[in-house]
């Protein structure tokens, strides 16, 4: 992959997105930074232009608004210099399912899933045609564990993982790398925006450590990168168990335990 390939990063004004911008700029990539806060975007862009001598464009966009989303989609479809998409924009929310309003649930699903898949859909055909490029989707370990109690948020992140794994199977033979990154709790503003006190969390990872680890996985071309997972064999075992389960599914035959034995 050309080191000068432009990288488009959503949710780029702070946190994980901003650190991705810094790291890709350090690698010599030009950038397109997308977020709602134009003041923060411009400050980051100015800093990166000065420190790394790269071109940085900014797109102010709220990806839950269809007009803004279509603008970013058009940039991904039409700008042939963009070879890497970092689908980072996302949100969380506090409270149990019955405490969350219908509107807040719809907003969360729109940002965490609809925007992400539409942006991937906008760039993927062009990357396949080029036979090169990458899509990085930021998920969460919460998507593996309904036990964490964040049902809607976790469901959106389970979607991100499933989509990423499916796209990897579809697109990697055509030269396009797809990576799912699954952080655990990371020190970003997402917690405050969700109404969650970060100080109540027992453990939390620093953003720079998370992104640096994710980029190790990126360079290794891992389809799924889980920086907080200490034993890689655990993930391998989970995938092996999943494959074994699939082998037990008989599409034309009801399992014996559900048959009327009376």
Predicted regions located by residue number:
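Active-site helix of classical SDR
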Residues: 120, 156
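Conserved glycine-rich cofactor-binding loop
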Residues: 11-15
């Amino acid at each position: 992959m050309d080191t000068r390939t432009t990288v488009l990063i959503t949710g780029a004004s702070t946190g994980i997105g901003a650190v991705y911008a810094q790291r890709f700029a350090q690698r010599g990539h030009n950038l397109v930074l997308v977020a709602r806060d134009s003041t923060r975007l411009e400050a980051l862009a100015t800093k990166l232009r000065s420190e790394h001598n790269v071109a940085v464009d900014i797109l102010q966009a709220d990806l839950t608004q269809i007009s803004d989303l279509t603008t970013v989609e058009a940039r991904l479809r039409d700008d042939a210099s963009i070879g890497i998409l970092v689908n980072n924009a996302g949100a969380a929310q506090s409270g149990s399912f019955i405490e969350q309003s219908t509107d807040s649930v719809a907003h969360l699903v729109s940002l965490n899933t609809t925007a992400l898949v539409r942006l991937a859909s906008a760039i993927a055909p062009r990357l396949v045609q080029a036979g090169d490029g990458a899509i990085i989707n930021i998920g969460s370990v919460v998507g593996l564990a309904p036990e964490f109690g964040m049902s809607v948020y976790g469901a959106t992140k389970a979607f991100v993982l499933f989509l990423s794994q499916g796209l990897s199977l579809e697109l990697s033979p055509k030269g396009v790398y797809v990576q799912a990154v699954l952080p655990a709790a990371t020190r970003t503003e997402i917690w405050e925006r969700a109404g969650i006190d970060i100080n109540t969390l027992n453990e939390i990872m620093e953003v720079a450590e998370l992104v640096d680890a994710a980029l190790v996985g990126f360079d290794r071309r891992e389809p799924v990168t889980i920086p907080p997972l200490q034993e890689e064999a655990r993930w391998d075992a989970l995938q092996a168990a999943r494959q074994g389960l699939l082998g037990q599914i008989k599409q034309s035959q009801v399992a014996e335990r559900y048959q009327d034995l009376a």
